[in-house]
Every structure is written in C-alpha cells, then in structure tokens.
A protein has these predicted regions:
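Extracellular beta-rich repeat passengers
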Residues: 237-410
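Acidic Gly/Asp/Thr-rich repetitive segments characteristic of extracellular carbohydrate-active
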Residues: 32-86, 451
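Right-handed parallel beta-helix
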Residues: 106, 110-111, 132-143, 159-172, ...
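Short, composition-biased motifs enriched in small/polar/acidic residues
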Residues: 413-431, 435-477, 650-727
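Extracellular beta-strand-rich solenoid/capping regions of secreted or surface-exposed proteins
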Residues: 69-82, 93-110, 119-137, 143-161, ...
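Short, solvent-exposed loop/turn segments at the edges of extracellular beta-sandwich modules
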Residues: 537-544, 636-643
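Surface-exposed or secretory-pathway low-complexity segments enriched in glycine-proline
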Residues: 481-521, 548-552, 567-569, 574-583, ...
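Extracellular beta-strand/beta-solenoid scaffold signature
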Residues: 122-126, 148-156, 172-180, 201-214, ...
Length: 727
C-alpha cells in the first residue's frame, strides 16, 4: 500500500542534509547526542560546548529572588543563558515545590554524575517545553500524590524538537507517566515507565496511563523501554503523529495495551483530517495479573491509522513462562490500514526480540544506581507478579502493597520513596564537570576549566567523554594494579544470569571461579581509558544478551576504592535440623574505611545474613545430615563505585541420631513417655490404635534431654506411640 504517500503535505526543514519521504523532510544529524543514542532525537546537541552548573543541594524554591535558590536544580535551568551541562555534587530526593519546567534550549541534565544513590524528583512533574536540543539521562521522576492538587504527568515533552530521554525511570503519575505532544524529533530510550496511579486524584477518575503521544509533524522514537502496571495507554496515539515503537517491553496492562485515537477524540486539533503512522517492530507483550485483554497489543481507531508491524511477541497465557509468539496481525484490533513496508526511512536499529527483552530488564531505567522501587518492578516482571496501584504510602506490614478503604473505595497503596544516600562527589578543582582524578588520568589540566570543550577524535568534547563514561557501567583501576568487580552489583542486581567476559582494551580481564566477579589488570605504566565486554545468559530461558561495554579508568591518583576483605572462617559444624549461627567479619582497607554491607551471594533456603552486622543464620534441613555443604556470602562497601568480595563457607552437617522412645506405666490410666535424643531438632510424637492411622499428639524441641511427658490414655484398647524427626 503506497497510495497514502501522496496525502502528506507538511514539511519540516532544518539543517544541511535530509531524508525525504513524500513531502515530509527530516534532518539527519551525523553526530549522535552520545554513543548509543538512536532514533528521531538522537542528534540532540544538548549542552555541548557550553558552561557547567553544579547542583550542590536538594532544595527547591518558588520565588525567583529566594536566596536559597543557588545550587538547586531549578536554578541551574532558570539561570542558563546559553548551552549548559548540569552535573550533580549530591545524590538524593528533590521534593519539587511546583513543576520543574525545562524551557531552555541546548541543555544537558547528566543524572549519571550524581554520587550516592542518584537523583529522584518527586511531588510534581518534569516538563520539557518550548525547547530544542535537550538531553536528559539517568534520572528518576516519581511525583506521587503528596500534593493534593496535582493531576499531572511524570514527564511531559511539549512543543519541542531534538530531545532525547535516556535511562529515565518514571512512575507514580496521576495523569500519564510520560507523554510527548506537539513535538517532533524526540527519542525516549532505555526508560522504565511504570506504575501510574490508577484510582488517584485525577478529576476524570481512573487514570492509570502510560503515555499520550500526539500533535507533531515529525517522528517520535520509543526504543527499548519498559511499560509496566498501567491500566491503558501503552501508548495512546493521537493526531499528526509518526511513531517508531521498537524493541519495547509491555507488561501487565489492564483494560488496553496500546491504542489510537479517532476522528472524534482528537477533533479539536485535527482540522486538516485525522492521521497517524505507527511502526510497531520487535516488541514483547506479556499479560499479567491485571490484564483483561491478553491477546491484543494495539487497537486502531480510524482507517487513517497506518500500521507497519514486524517480529512482535505476545505472551498472553499467564503461565509463568516466557513463551510469547508472533501472532502477526492477529494482535492488532480496531480500525486501521495495514502497511507492507516501513513508512519512512529506517535509521533506528532493531535488536533480536529475546535479546531486547533481556537488555531492557538488565540495563534499562536509571540502572546506574537502581533503587529499591526499580528492583521491585524488575522482580514483578521476571516473576510475572505485581498489580495496578492507586496511591503511594507506607504499608503497615512488611509488604510492598496494601489495600485500604478510602471514602468507601478500596485502593491499592504501594510502598513509597526509598531513602537515598547523598554520597560524596569527587574533587573538581576547576569546576568544569570533570573530577580531578579523571583529568589527570586522561591528560587534561584539572586547573583549566576551558579544556572541558576540547573536541576529541569521535566528535565529542572532553566533558562529554566523561559523561558518556559515567553513563555506562564503569570501574576505576589503580595504575600498575588490578581491580575486582562484582558484575551482579555493577549491572543492575539481576539474579539468575551466567556471565561471559570478552577481551577489551588497555588491560586483561578474567572471570573468577565464582562466575560473577571479574579481575581487570592494568598494563604496567599505563594510565587512561580501557574497557572490557560482558555478555550474559539468562538461566531460566536460555536467552543471551550483550555484549555490554564496561568502561575502565586506569588512574594515576589514589582515587580507586579498594575492595573489602573477609576474615578467615574455620570449618563449621552443625547438627541437621538445627540453626547454624555465625558472625561474618570483614575489613575495608580504604582511609577512611567505608561502611560495609553483608549479603547472601548464592541464595539457599533458610539462609539469611543481617546486612549491617554480618550475623548469619541457616536453618539446616534434616535431610542434609551426613553431608558437607558450601555457602557463599558477600560483602560490599559504600565507596564510589561500590566494591565487593565473596567468601566460601564450608559446613559439615552432622546427621541426627535416631531418637528413642520409652513408655513407663504409672497407674491404670497414666503413663510416663520418655524421649531420648539430642538437643536442637524438632521431634514429633504420634499415636495410633491400629498401626495404620497415626495422629500427632505433641511436637517438641526440648531444652534438656531426656524429656518426660505424662500421657493419659483412656479406653481398654491398645495404643501405640512412635517418634520421628520433624521435616
């Protein structure tokens, strides 16, 4: 079907060379915003070549004359007079007094530079409006319902061109989580768009929606994103829109996954006639507990909705396995026109579906410092659990969700904003956005702020090279030394992956025997940049993802964070059926020493470790008696980046001796039951009158043995007793 090409009459003309389809002209910029930027907004310049602003506190303000405005994120935007890059000297949560409006062009907000646990915005929206060339990376935006008057989106891009959002986590909006309207040349990639508040405080009622996209003369690209736990609009398309929807993962939608508006719903702004275009390629849709339309991915609203589809997987059976299939046009409903070819020049890469699925979960969202909210979302998608939510609060019990009655309506409350570590930013003497240790290692002058805009061989400035390094997984290695890296912690905390490492540059890398740590060894006398590659195998599905590039800075300063070390543990012994207790000890060689956190490296049933104290407890199953078991534990520090170490514990599990039971008669109706065994295990005494049906009469874990129990056994018939170990 190609006749539709003649109906396009609008033009967008910018830049110096163009791709053309029909009468629509679209600029193709040769320099991506950063390595890995794709799609319509990939050419955004951001703050390239401009000044640098440091966010030094988590405050916000209302009045433009407020003396506390200096050092805030809001003032970093408001005071920009030209290209600017905003970096962070503090991590934590910023409670917005009102919507944070990004209305300045040529601006980069580099959330990946925040120390500690990164940056979260809450209470109000992040709005990018009336701007061009904006880059926003590695932020969390979780407004919630703290402000009873708030009815907005989490993130809204409106009347903009050349904007890219990368690795942004958005949730708990009252309207849509992330919307783009009246804009063109916008990319939303590697973002997690999750848990819009369904029955909240919107004046239209239930409004748990993902994205509203409409009114733009150019192209929008949504690539490699997660949509999870929205009632609908995953996304919703309006008039005058061309959307590349590629390699996204949709999970647990409610009434509808995605759909298009129609002539009537978008009538106010479609005087020229309703039209939209959708390229729906390489997506995965998985129905969840809240899904009511498990077999439909997208519903068209008019014949002027033109759809091209290719290689999409739909898993609607809710059987707990990842076994989606491509049902072709069968997953599309409503009214629309099919396209046999991509409706405009294709520039966005398409990843194989299973690899795209894993990459979204492995490295998507604000994954550099993945908080407990995103970790919980990850587990709900992996385990095919979770639910739509209505409000943010603290459940009274130790759980993630709680149903409460509010004004006669049952609402699902979700656990709210986690506390975030502020961290400590590295020294930056010239305040050019690049730490001193970085500048020294790569041959820049830490006392000359002008070198931040020096162009490199790949077309990026020196500052952009640093920002791009910080945006991916990264480690620091000492000169003439080595560093051990825990890949599990570095790459998002996803259990159930087997790692593979590949050769990189300026160093050698080896996967250690525990399968999750690598050792990188720097070449003798070298300082500067290196890297290595990591791929992963998901053990549950057999699918592979990667490789992912891990950047290494070989430093000439003492900026490296040394890993902690465990104190030796002797051979441990425990009786089966009892609890092994041991306190782990570790030290940190850094000055000053970092705070240490202990954890279980390889999960075992009944095994736990207190994070702050290292107190280990393991309730040993009776069935393991007479065996030798291995436990794996780990410790990590609070440095930047966090370093860790693992330790193997060997446990000899002694078998429980067979207990003995004796019955001494006291008188005609009373007996004394005597139990001989060992302290610790649970014993079960059972009674029978026919040696076939046995009934438990007592379960005990006596403090001392032998243990005596008085039995009254009425009736003339025989009674039999036996003893066994509780399972």
């Amino acid at each position: 079907m190609t006749a539709w090409l003649g109906c396009l009459t609008k033009k967008l003309v910018v830049g110096c060379w163009f791709w053309v389809w029909s009468d629509v002209v679209w600029e193709a910029r040769s320099q991506p915003a950063f390595p890995g930027a794709v799609g319509a907004g990939a050419g955004s310049r951001g703050g390239r070549g401009g000044d640098v602003y440091y966010v030094t506190n988590l405050a916000d303000y209302v009045s433009a004359s407020d003396p506390k405005r200096f050092g805030t994120l809001r003032y970093g935007v408001a005071s920009a007079t030209g290209p600017r890059t905003i970096v962070f000297a503090v991590g934590g949560t910023i409670t917005l007094s009102n919507d944070l409006r990004i209305n300045k062009s040529q601006l980069t907000i580099a959330g990946q530079t925040a120390p500690g646990d990164g940056i979260t915005l809450r209470r109000r929206s992040l709005i990018v409006s009336d701007a061009r060339d904006v880059v926003i990376r590695h932020l969390r935006v979780r407004p919630g319902d703290l402000d009873p008057t708030f009815e907005g989106d989490g993130v809204w891009v409106v009347r903009c061109t050349n904007v890219i959002l990368d690795h942004v986590s958005v949730s708990w909006s009252v309207d849509e989580c992330l919307s783009v309207t009246h804009s063109s040349g916008v990319t939303v990639q590697r973002c997690w768009i999750t848990e819009s508040l369904n029955v909240s405080q919107h004046d239209k009622g239930a409004h748990g929606y993902g994205s509203l996209l409409r009114y733009g003369d150019g192209v929008l690209t949504f690539y490699g994103n997660l949509y999870a736990h929205h009632n609908s609009r995953n996304p919703r398309l309006g008039d005058r829109l061309r959307l590349e929807f590629i390699n996204n993962l949709l999970y647990n939608w409610g009434s509808r996954a995605g759909y298009s508006g129609d002539q009537s719903s978008d009538l106010a702004d479609n005087l020229g006639g309703f039209t939209n275009w959708l390229a729906y390629v390489g997506n995965v849709l998985v129905a969840g507990p809240s899904t009511r339309t498990p077999q439909t991915a997208f519903q068209g609203g008019a014949t002027n909705t033109y759809i091209f589809r290719q290689d999409n997987w739909l898993d609607g059976n809710r059987n707990g396995r990842w076994d989606g299939v491509d049902t072709g046009w069968g997953m599309f409903g409503g009214t629309y026109t099919r396209l046999a070819q991509w409706p405009w020049p294709m520039t966005t890469p398409v990843e194989e579906v299973s690899a795209a699925f894993l990459r979204i979960l492995w490295r998507g969202g604000a994954s550099g410092k993945r908080d407990s909210v995103d970790r919980r979302i990850l587990e709900t998608v992996r385990n095919q659990t979770g639910r739509l939510v209505d409000a943010v609060g603290e459940p009274t019990q130790d759980q993630d969700y709680e149903i409460r009655s509010v004004n006669g309506t049952h609402l699902v409350f979700v656990r709210g904003w986690p506390a975030l570590r502020a961290g400590e930013a590295p020294a930056d003497a010239d305040q050019d956005g690049m730490p001193d240790f970085w500048e020294l290692a790569v041959g820049l002058n830490p006392l000359d702020a002008r070198d931040r805009n020096r162009a490199g061989p790949e077309g990026y400035t020196a500052l952009e090279d640093y920002l791009n390094w910080r945006a991916g997984p990264w480690v620091i290695c000492p000169r003439n030394g080595s560093v051990v890296v825990d890949l599990h912690e570095l790459l998002g905390g996803w259990e159930g992956l087997a790692y593979e490492v590949g050769a990189g540059s300026n160093g050698t890398v080896t996967l250690l025997p525990d399968g999750r740590r690598v050792r990188f060894i720097a070449p003798s006398g070298f300082s500067g940049l290196g890297h290595f590659a990591v791929a992963a195998l998901d053990l549950a599905t057999g699918w592979r993802v990667g490789p992912e590039r891990v950047g290494v800075l070989v430093s000439i300063t003492n900026a490296v964070n040394e890993p902690p070390g465990f104190q030796s543990v002797p051979l441990l012994e425990v009786l089966a059926g009892t609890t092994l207790e041991w306190t782990l000890r570790a030290t940190d060689p850094d000055e000053p020493a970092q705070t240490l956190r202990f954890w279980v490296a390889v999960p075992r049933s009944g095994l736990s470790v207190e994070a702050g104290t290292g107190r280990l407890q393991w309730r040993v199953p009776v069935a393991l008696g007479g065996t030798i078991q291995t436990l794996w534990v780990a410790v990590s520090d609070s440095g930047e980046p966090s370093m860790s170490a693992t330790q193997q514990l060997t446990v000899v599990v002694r078998a429980v001796p067979v207990p003995r039971l004796a019955l001494d008669r006291k008188d005609e109706s009373e007996w004394i039951l005597r139990v001989d065994g060992v302290n610790g295990p649970d014993y079960v005494v059972e009674r029978s009158e026919d040696l076939v049906r046995w009934q438990e009469v007592v379960r005990t874990n006596p403090a001392t043995l032998p243990w005596l129990w008085r039995v009254r056994d009425p009736g003339p018939g025989p009674a039999f007793y036996r003893i066994r170990l509780a399972p």
